[in-house]
């Protein structure tokens, strides 16, 4: 089975895009590990190891997608490093801050 360059790039981008749905620490870890893995695959000369790396990455994408859905089911507070988002929760926090300053 030959893997096209387009498939590899799409897989890489999908993993990075899906990783952004995680909280800060998991997101940064997953992005860093993904970049490192694909840098290794870029210089891999053995086709069998390359294809196995792609299969592992496809499994990783499935795991990340499943886990991001599970994480999204639970209401969580953002870490300080993430800042306030533009969701309804962020708007409520901003309105309370403005009211307390008045």
Swiss-Prot record:
Any single GO BP term: iron-sulfur cluster assembly
Record's signal peptide: none
Localization: Mitochondrion
Keyword Iron set for record: no
GO cellular component, one term: mitochondrial [2Fe-2S] assembly complex
Superkingdom as given in the UniProt entry: Eukaryota
Pfam family, one: Complex1_LYR
Keywords (A to Z) from UniProt: Mitochondrion
Role according to the record: Required for mitochondrial iron-sulfur (Fe-S) protein biosynthesis.
PANTHER family registered for this protein in UniProt: LYR MOTIF-CONTAINING PROTEIN 4, PROTEIN C6ORF149
Family recorded in the similarity comment: Belongs to the complex I LYR family.
Protein name: Protein isd11
Source organism: Schizosaccharomyces pombe (strain 972 / ATCC 24843) (Fission yeast)
Lineage: Eukaryota, Fungi, Dikarya, Ascomycota, Taphrinomycotina
Gene: isd11
């Amino acid at each position: 089975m030959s893997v096209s360059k387009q498939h590899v790039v799409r897989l890489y981008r999908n993993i990075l895009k899906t990783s952004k749905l995680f909280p800060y620490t998991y997101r940064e870890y997953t992005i860093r590990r993904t970049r490192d893995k694909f840098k290794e695959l870029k210089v891999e000369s053995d086709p069998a190891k390359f294809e196995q790396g792609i299969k592992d990455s496809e499994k990783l994408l499935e795991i990340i997608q499943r886990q991001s859905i599970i994480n999204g089911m639970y209401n969580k507070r953002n870490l300080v490093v993430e800042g306030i988002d533009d969701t309804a929760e962020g708007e409520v926090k901003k309105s309370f801050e403005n009211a307390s300053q008045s």
